Amino acid sequence: SSLARATSRSFAVTLDYGLVPPSASVPAAPRFLARLIQKLPPFIGKSGFATGLDHARLRLSPTRVRVRSFLSGSDAARTSFRVPVADSGDVHLVPARSNPKAWRNTLSIDMLPLVGVQLRADVASQRDLRDYGDSTPIARVARLARRSLLGLAVGFEVQRTFGTFFGLTPQVASWLRPRGTLSSGFSLTRDPNGRAPLRAAGDSAGAFRLPTAFSNSQRLDLGTQVDLSRLGRGLFGDASVVTRALARVTTIDLGLTRDRTSTFSGVAVPPGFGYQLAWIGVDGFRSQRGVFATSAAENSTRHASAAASLPLGIRVSSTYQWTRGLTWLLRADGQLPISSWSREWPSATVTWTVSPSRGTVGRVLTSLTA
């Protein structure tokens, strides 16, 4: 058992604002360009791409904007006593206090500039409003990192996240359905309770900074679906033997996926804006400002799949997949690369479906699949 007295108070204030601006758009392409494409052979001039380009408009205003601000804090105190009755030594007891205060702001923007194009950005920042005093070196650094806005103390940033998304599903042709997405995510954390501050430029020069850790990720996904039946009708007509043969191939899907990630810890200086947006090459994931990442990785996958319906109720589906992975781990003398790869091929499935005649066993057995 323990003898203690505890008190606590807390507050929270939230401001949430959402806006759906009216549409403001301009023609996506000059009129002469749309007319020029329509005069090309029917395979292109009468495609969905040509029709869409003639009517497409570029929307300049976002479809949705949301801003959220959240202010929270608490004040708690706890005093522990030695005996269950009042004692003269109680006047020397110092309560243990905790008064965290934080201010978090988020911003989300959605845009649909064109049909089949989607953009999204999410930004969040959290600030620590506490005054850590000057009793320790890292507390003094935390105090010096504090900022003010319009004469009000707004503390220092302890967390930041940044996410982006770009999606593309263009209407190229009725037989071709390409797709593509590019997304990124960034996270940064500063630790005001670390053991010691870090120098921005080596061990003996540069300003002191709070220990910082950050990471990012990038994912690229490209692919397309091909409808050979529609392609055959557009090239050879509906009654062609080639069209009927191509119609048996029901699905063709091609795709490429690439993931890149990296993590940094114990860093004094935050990364550049390009790293936060993941607009960098693989070398930028491995190192920033001369500092190697604690870990970094790049994984890519290529896949293809197809399915065909053959006579006599036979259906064949096949898949090809190739995966390569490369990971870099931090060591004392640099980074150690670890590579791996795998291939899934051949991989196929054959199914046979028979529907017996209603005049025989079909009365009790409607279909048989093997």
Residue ranges and their predicted role:
Residues 1-369:
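Exposed, low-structure sequence patches enriched in small/polar residues
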